[in-house]
Amino acid sequence: MSDDKRAKSDKNEKNKYPVNLLDTPFPMRGDLPKREPQWVKQWQDKQLYKKIRAARKGAKKFVLHDGPPYANGDIHIGHAVNKVLKDMIIKARGLTGLDAVYVPGWDCHGMPIEIQIEKKFGKGLPVQEVQAKARAYATEQIKRQMVDFERLGVLGDWDHPYLTMNYRNEADELRALGKIMEKGYVFRGLKPVNWCFDCGSALAEAEVEYKDKVDLSIDVGFPFAEADKLAHAFKVPVEQIDARPGWIVIWTTTPWTIPSNQALNVHPEVEYALVDTPRGHLILATERVEEQLKVYALEGKVIATATGAALSEIRFHHPLAKMDGGYDRLSPIYLGDYVTTDTGSGIVHSAPAYGVEDFQSCKAHGMPDSDIISPVMGNGVYAGTLPLFGGLSIWDANPRIVEALQESGNLFNSHKYTHSYMHCWRHKTPIIYRATSQWFAGMDVDPAEENGKPVPTLRETALAGIDATEFYPAWGKQRLHNMIANRPDWTLSRQRQWGVPMAFFVHKETGALHPRTPELLEAIAKRVEQQGIEAWQTLDPAELLGDEASQYEKNRDTLDVWFDSGTTHWTVIRGSHRDDLYDPSADEADGRLADLYLEGSDQHRGWFHSSLLTASMLYGKPPYKALLTHGFTVDGEGRKMSKSIGNTVSPQDIANKMGAEIIRLWVASTDYSGELSISDEILKRVVESYRRIRNTLRFLLSNLSDYDHGKHALPAAEWLEIDRYAVALTAQLQKEVLSHYEAYEFHPVVAKLQTFCSEDLGGFYLDVLKDRLYTTAPDSKARRAAQNALYHITQAMLHWMAPFLSFTAEEAWQVFAHGTAHTDTIFTSTYYAVPEVDDADDLLQKWHTLREVRAEVTRQLEAVRVEGEIGSSLQAELTIQAGGPVLEALQSLGDDLRFVLLTSAAKVTAAPEAGDLLVTVTPSAHAKCERCWHYRADVGHNPDHPTLCGRCDSNLFGAGEHRSHA
């Protein structure tokens, strides 16, 4: 009988023969969009996070250090995933009794905010004004984002977040810079760095993304200049070389770099051919001759070969020399192991200002910085002094360069070519490598000795740190290892306004740092601590340098924003939030301050990366014990979220329409190690899952509404057997749930909770229990035993779900725990200690068998119902034939077996064969009890109550029925 039907029946009969149908203030409808904001306000008003911390005072700390989101724009679904995952971990760890600390943070400096200030107020503002407006803008953005994060049910120290723009944090960042300078990691040099013309600044590796780009691909000939050396290398007469024009041919997809060419590269071990063609002699890699001649539409014959090593230092004319005397220079061949013969001619042209390998090759051959030709300015335009192309942007110059090469007679082929190319992640525009004078943290420099002993390089220290770190999922370790192993020096400097200054004084003539730089940095940091980075702008050098001020100038570079967030283990954990986050015991143990860093998979090259490098320089260790990575959100078809596609999902919209609890349950039920798919259809399924869990909770709370554990608790030995089984099953599941939480695995917890609610409880235990709960005497031992089990199940279940269904668990807890020590909130309690059941293993095995029998019985009952012979299962009587342990289990229940199988009678006999299970269903010939709806022979045995069966008569007016098993 359904609860609704019983309620209607009870009402219609005016409780003539009442059943124990109780109610609860916990409603069936969650009405989440309306109720959740009330919970958020209540948590804020009673300072819930502070209460939780107070309850855990003195406990071991668990520190999840927040990777700061950028203070610009509304939060998106990726932010929601990130914050909910963090919140679930903090709550799950807190429920173990740990002092789980969460201080949210924001990344505040950098280009995106500068762009917003330019949009609102125009370009050309004084630096101080830009900084003031940027600070105000970031503050406003943080307020907006904070509201949305709290709306998601995320608990943390929202009253005291950390901000990279806080004066103290800015000052401590300068102190961190001073520290790594003293240790010998920082140097200044000319190097090609990732450069964005729109940013007007160098970019970090993490700020570069790759997209397809269509470029002009060209094959360019560099005319022979040293025939005698070529003749010697190829072992042919010099007259043969001189007899015809000749070129060494290169292939490139960046025509704009040709004006800056200063060398050519060949592989020392590759064989190169001197090829005779109708156009003249060509030098190509031997294995590329056939393919390249087709491209050039030429016939040809190899007349000699030589290794790349034999061609070393031979020089060739610049291909634009005939067009303008400014290009009248020679390009030597340098050997390079990186040259391949997969595509092109097997020869690479080298413009050291615009390629990392080009630069390294030319520097290795003694080219001084002053000789490097670098005509491209920071805005992507050639300097006006560049012959032929001065004043043009490099992209506009590409076709002009091709025309000039054609006119000079040195172009062999040009065509459009699609390839993966570097783009700025902010502007989505192509970027280049550009040699500029920058400040670097050297990956392979030898740091200063400590205590007279050599210190490993930054690369070595960081790689060792990775080996000492736990990764969730495990594949993250190799990914980060590969990035660190292969990365170039870290470009620390940026050419921006809204950022922490690299507050150095540089000698005007020599470019050398002031000899008292560490001391001066501390003096500047003290000013920044009081006035913010603006203090550097207003500082008169004479205040610190005295008479030397005229010899020095302020360095105008700012620090990479990845240094801002990458040093928060120093500026926040050891600095501004030391009282909350710093754990001296962890520091003394191994120096790793945070238990966990958790971010999206892009942060292997972002925050995980920069934090590892800064901590390796400062302490020689990572700042974290473990790294957890989550995937990106995609739509139901696996496509990335994109405004242009129109498939973006707003967490604010979901919270307002369905409830933040639905976002939380979606995050928890998804395997975050891969992509997280979200769509309307997926969210509908999540809503259904939520309803099932909520309905289970409502049933539990309703049937516990007259239960007081202090008065009605019974020892486990006095419970019915099925109750002991249900609690044993709960205890078994609790071990699995806590094990998953310990490993940061949430989707198995949700899956098991759903199965527990729908199959173990709704599909079995609660289904069996309804008769006992509703029909036995209210204060009978049989009913109180059932309530004992429900109490323990509810305690455990509310704690399992609290980390992800926080609003719902808290709402249910207020009903369930009313009047207890933890009435205020579930989050100051700990995971429930589910009582031990002595015969748990035997019970679990026995009732597993009984449930298998029940499943077969249900199938047989359904077949008979479909035939129209019965309506409900209570109209049926069963005869079951079984053997072996199955027979033993069935017989052990006696008359209680009918309650387990939801029939009015169940008879068990031995089967002909031990392994048989035969079920016979017979429609009952007896009358139906008006109260319990069972069909029994004793209905009407008491003439005073002719519509009641014997047990209902006894439960209402006599001593009550006796139950042992179910």
UniProtKB/Swiss-Prot annotation:
EC numbers, comma separated: 6.1.1.5
Bias type Basic and acidic residues, positions: 1-16
Subcellular location: Cytoplasm
Gene that encodes it: ileS
Region annotation (Disordered) ranges: 1-24
Positions occupied by motif 'HIGH' region: 69-79
GO annotation (BP), single: isoleucyl-tRNA aminoacylation
Known catalytic reactions: tRNA(Ile) + L-isoleucine + ATP = L-isoleucyl-tRNA(Ile) + AMP + diphosphate
GO cellular component terms listed in the entry, alphabetical order: cytosol
Protein's recorded name: Isoleucine--tRNA ligase
Organism: Cupriavidus taiwanensis (strain DSM 17343 / BCRC 17206 / CCUG 44338 / CIP 107171 / LMG 19424 / R1) (Ralstonia taiwanensis (strain LMG 19424))
PANTHER family xrefs: ISOLEUCINE--TRNA LIGASE, MITOCHONDRIAL, SOLEUCYL-TRNA SYNTHETASE
Record's cofactor remark: Binds 1 zinc ion per subunit.
Binding site for L-isoleucyl-5'-AMP: E599
Gene3D superfamilies registered for this protein in UniProt: 1.10.730.20, HUPs (3.40.50.620), Valyl/Leucyl/Isoleucyl-tRNA synthetase, editing domain (3.90.740.10)
Residues binding ATP: K643
Classification via CDD domains: Anticodon_Ia_Ile_BEm, IleRS_core
